[in-house]
Amino acid sequence: MAQKTSGLIQRCRFLLLMILFLPHVMTSSVLSVNGKTENYILDTEPGLQESLKCAVQNHIRDEELLWYREDGRVDLKSGNKINSSSVCVSGISEDDNGITFTCKLQRNQSVSISVVLNVTFPPLLSGNDFQTAEEGSDVKLVCNVKSNPQAQMMWYKNNGILNLENHHQIQQTSEYFQLSITKVKKSDNGTYSCIANSLIETKTKDFHLIVKDKGSTVPIEPIIAACVVVFLTLVFGVIARRKRIMKLCRKDQGPQCRTAL
């Protein structure tokens, strides 16, 4: 009987320990941002303001939260740290596209959740509007482009699709769309249009190319040498003339006498 009672007591102790430790096992803290418990992408636009609210779920004690913008820690007020914390992203611009905001538990920073800003905007085009080139030289028309989503790019010439010739070359990156023309000809004169077509809007920027006649090449060295010869000739001529004048003056000078009348 005593053995049965002892075994029953041990079982009760075991069950009691399981009950005590169960909340710690089942209620591990989970973070959410704006109600989402997984990392996500937030679609937004320039000029808008977005609010991100991070909250601790299943916590059994007060938890301090941290916010990071990329690798930089966000300065939070004292009343905006415990169990829930909000940050406002105001004045969103095109440069904020791809920026990551991360909320972390202070005591265990491996517990975190991130939000990536997806700032959508129409194409922004820029570049040198006017270029003048000498016939036979090389020219680069660089159309700087910024767009999200990425735009489809094309070159037009004088309002028509550009017919690429052997001396034309196109290069495209995520930041620019470039047309290179080697040994430009008179026929390359005209207005070149950089066209960006995105799902939001189509934008155009014009580049005006003026090809001048090839100037005659004048050798500079012979001109300099001729100028030096002329200068030295003039100098020697002046010196020789001065010596001749001085000789004539000496011949004209003789003994002077005073005559009293």
From Swiss-Prot:
Residues 28-219 are extracellular. It holds the Pfam family I-set. It comes from the Eukaryota. Glycans are attached at residues 83, 108, 118, 189. GO terms for cellular component: cytoplasm; neuron projection; plasma membrane. Residues 28-114, 122-208 form the Ig-like C2-type domain. The chain crosses the membrane at residues 220-240. Disulfide bonds join 54-103, 143-194. It is a single-pass type I membrane protein. Residues 1-27 form the signal peptide. GO terms for biological process: negative regulation of apoptotic process; regulation of cell migration; regulation of cell population proliferation; regulation of membrane permeability. SMART domains: IG (SM00409), IGc2 (SM00408). Gene3D superfamilies: Immunoglobulins. N-glycosylated. Residues 241-261 are cytoplasmic. Keywords: Cell membrane, Cytoplasm, Disulfide bond, Glycoprotein, Immunoglobulin domain, Membrane, Repeat, Signal, Transmembrane, Transmembrane helix. It is found in: Cell membrane; Cytoplasm. Homodimer. May control cell-cell adhesion, cell migration and proliferation, cell morphology, and protects renal epithelial cells from oxidative cell injury to promote cell survival. This is Transmembrane and immunoglobulin domain-containing protein 1.
